[in-house]
Amino acid sequence: KKRGVYVAIVSSGVDIFVGAIANMLKVDDWVANGFEWDDEGWLLGGLPTRVLTHDKGIMVEKLARINGFKPSQIVSVGDSSTDLSMRIEGSKFIGFNPRRKRALEAFMEADVPVVEEKNLSLIWPLIFPGEEIP
């Protein structure tokens, strides 16, 4: 963020959890799926799906349009094969710490860079080649 990078979370997970993580990380924006609760706190059911697991690119495109970003300015980072759907035409994708063999295979097949360690600082040179982390 100090570099002026806009950070957003696009998750097909539950908004209560994603919102807490987004708040903790102080990201610029986030989107996830939610539930509807009654006045007594009982679960009524799921709300319409905002983020489709296999089509997260829809939300990436919306965030780009809302914020005036060109696809060439977007780098998505994900740990699962379904996260590859965030790679909209003209954008980049980095596979990060894939936990499943299927995810690693999908990243390799998609010919995207992959960081196999649980160290997020390792994506820096993939986003800013030749630069040190400030």
Task: Please tell me what each predicted stretch does.
Residues 1-134:
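C-terminal cap/substrate-recognition subdomain and adjoining C-terminal extension
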